[in-house]
Amino acid sequence: MARVKRGVQAHARHKKVLKAAKGYYSARRKTFRVAKQAVIKAGQYAYRDRKTKKRQFRQLWIIRINAGARIHGLSYSRFINGLKKSGIAVDRKILSELAVYDKSVFATLAEKAKAALSA
């Protein structure tokens, strides 16, 4: 039986890793051993940050809604409570967009929330 050399597979594997490390600086781009570690670490960061992105955007939306609600004399929690009591089901992403870009619609929502809280 002929001896099997693994040069082709090794070269393909190295090429794959170095392609994934494109755009990195110095040895992280050129040297296979260092590039492999850098690609693995980048994957770990990407996995972690896909989770934190959701948290960060929710925080941003809440900050924007709170700022918009305080202009109309409500805190964030009272505004959300008022919306729930009045039966308005709008998610935080849309509420934050309204608070930033469509202030007149947000003002009507704030008035409805106030009315539901006082009733």
Swiss-Prot record:
Sequence similarity: Belongs to the bacterial ribosomal protein bL20 family.
Keyword Ribosomal protein: yes
UniProt superkingdom: Bacteria
Pfam families in the record: Ribosomal_L20
The keyword Ribonucleoprotein belongs to this UniProt entry's keyword annotation: yes
Protein name: Large ribosomal subunit protein bL20
Keywords assigned: Ribonucleoprotein, Ribosomal protein, RNA-binding, rRNA-binding
Source species: Dichelobacter nodosus (strain VCS1703A)
